[in-house]
Amino acid sequence: MILEMTDGYEGTQAAIAELYVLDNNGERVPREGWTVDYVSSEDNEGVNRTGDKIFDLQESTYWQSKPGAGYPHIVVIDLGRPVNASAIQYLPRMEPGAPGAIKNVKVYMK
């Protein structure tokens, strides 16, 4: 799965606390076996905001693009098996006023 974030609500940073893929029945696809194949930018200097935080089952952790890196931001996730997806659910950072709210995203499935 490829996520291409093309715009945000404020600034150039993007952040995802949790991401879920829904199957054709609207059920969440198990995330065991998911791996990050590529991120165009991640904030890992002195903090741990790497791509794998998107599906680590902890809403308090998150992936965030590196400060100053402009859009688009791309994350490639290997779902570990074929998935017939009908939708995704995205949980943003939960802190009040936190940067990184994503406005537009394109999702590509193979």
What are these regions (language model features)?
Residues 98-110:
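Short, surface-exposed beta-strand/strand-loop-strand elements in extracellular ectodomains
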Residues 9-85, 93-100:
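Disordered, acidic Ser/Thr/Pro-rich linker "stalks" and the adjacent N-terminal cap
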